[in-house]
Amino acid sequence: MKTLEEIRKIREEKRRELNIRVDTTVGEKEKHILVCHGTGCTSSKSTQVIENFRRLVKEKKLENVRVIQTGCFGLCAKGPIVIIRPEDTFYAMVKPEDCEEIIQKHIIDGEIVERLLCKDIDGTKVNKLDDLTFYKKQKRIALQNSGKI
């Protein structure tokens, strides 16, 4: 059993991590790479995407970058889905070989990888998951915290 003080310390550490995922103005120096690991994305090689990101983060010694396996984001047809926090950039149909480009261009150079942005129903590229027409009219209940917890 942990002491009350140890539990408080764990709570504060986790609260800081969650703030990066909930409040996009927090943690500009720290990045979280959220990778969907729902069944649809897993069948499209999201496990390899996660492994590649983790390997690259370690190889490049990116101490302020965390790779986080998440549950389903609810748009399986566009998987594997990767979201970079805190800016909430939404990449779709990410292949294992795309990880190097995302790490170099987005994480290190601070540039969006345009070719991996999701296209909306009218063909325009969308930077953020919530800007997709697919999500705009939805009231997400079961998936409201997807990628946050």
Predicted features by range, described:
Residues 1-149:
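Feature of Fe-S/electron-transfer and energy-metabolism proteins
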